[in-house]
């Protein structure tokens, strides 16, 4: 496969917009054997949502399904970029990019604009590209600097025995 700005790193996460993270995690684990799931308390961040600055409050949890990270997002504020699809369930997959601005530009050149952008407290730039008109979902892009965190989620799953599914991150 030839390398492009978007395929250097494989898709490494799928994300679900959920009403109740713990219930979803338990159902996903029971069916697929995914887990354990490490959750974070709600946080509020100022984000750009379709050109408007909003305060987004949400909780997240992360689990593992083979080599794929599973992210669960429970949103506690409105408006928000998760409810646009009109239902709970699959929301986006994630790909790392070395050139964030170049990726945004490449998507714009073929008609796909960001639904949402933000910069984390640690300086990580994140965007959800709106691919719904063609693919029915969004794509999250950001730099691979998150790899150590993602590796820690995978490490929690490595020798997991199926018990203690729901854990507070950092506890």
What is each model feature region?
Residues 1-12, 16-38, 52-111, 130-171:
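Glyoxalase I/VOC metalloenzyme domain signal
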Residues 10, 121-125:
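Short acidic/glycine-enriched loop/turn segments that link adjacent beta-strands
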Residues 38-44, 117-121:
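A short, aromatic/hydrophobic, helix- or strand-capping loop or linear motif
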Residues 41-47, 109-113:
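Short Pro/Gly-enriched beta-strand edge/turn motifs at strand-loop
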Residues 45-47, 81, 124-126:
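Short secondary-structure boundary/hinge segments and terminal tails
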Residues 114, 126-128:
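Intrinsic, low-complexity N-terminal interaction/targeting segments
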């Amino acid at each position: 496969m030839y390398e492009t700005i978007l395929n250097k790193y494989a898709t490494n996460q799928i994300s679900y917009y959920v009403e109740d993270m713990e219930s979803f995690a338990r159902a996903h684990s029971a069916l697929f054997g995914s887990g354990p799931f490490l959750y974070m308390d709600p946080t509020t961040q100022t984000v750009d949502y379709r050109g408007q600055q909003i305060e987004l409050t949400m909780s997240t949890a992360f689990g593992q399904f083979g080599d794929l990270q599973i992210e669960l997002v429970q949103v506690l504020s409105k408006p928000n970029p998760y409810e646009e699809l009109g239902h709970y369930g699959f929301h986006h997959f994630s790909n790392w990019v070395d050139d964030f601005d170049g990726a945004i530009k490449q998507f714009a050149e073929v008609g796909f604009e960001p639904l949402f952008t933000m910069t984390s407290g640690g300086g990580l730039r994140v965007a959800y590209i709106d691919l719904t008109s063609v693919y029915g979902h969004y794509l999250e892009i950001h730099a691979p600097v998150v790899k150590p965190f993602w590796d820690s989620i995978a490490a929690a799953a490595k020798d997991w025995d199926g018990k203690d599914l729901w854990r507070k991150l950092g506890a």
